[in-house]
């Protein structure tokens, strides 16, 4: 069982996934810093408050922290857009690679070639 686990872990997909998760976590920290330190102050200039995370709505005893929710939305939109750009670039690269690789002959192609050779052989006789 341990041997199977080692084989599973050593497969490329699992290692790629692990690297992706680690890079994603680091990237999330960068985006959160971008939102907190650059984007929120810019938005704050227009609404008169620098720190959006402190925006709240008090209804009775309930305190709704919609500013933190806005920060999360901004983080999500930035991360989603960058992931979209990465996927788009990867798809473009993969598509070019597929176009450059000539298609291998199919079974039908081989059968047509055999048929043509047989016709040619019969016409020679």
From Swiss-Prot:
Record-linked Gene3D superfamilies: Large-conductance mechanosensitive channel, MscL, domain 1
Keyword Nucleotide-binding: no
Annotated membrane topology: Multi-pass membrane protein
Transmembrane segments: 14-34, 67-87
Coiled coil (UniProt feature): none
UniProt keywords, alphabetically: Cell membrane, Ion channel, Ion transport, Membrane, Transmembrane, Transmembrane helix, Transport
Keyword Ribonucleoprotein appears in the UniProt entry: no
Annotated compartments: Cell membrane
Matching PROSITE patterns: MSCL (PS01327)
One Pfam assignment: MscL
Molecular function GO labels: mechanosensitive monoatomic ion channel activity
GO cellular component, one term: plasma membrane
Annotated family: Belongs to the MscL family.
Protein purpose: Channel that opens in response to stretch forces in the membrane lipid bilayer. May participate in the regulation of osmotic pressure changes within the cell.
Subunit structure: Homopentamer.
Protein name: Large-conductance mechanosensitive channel
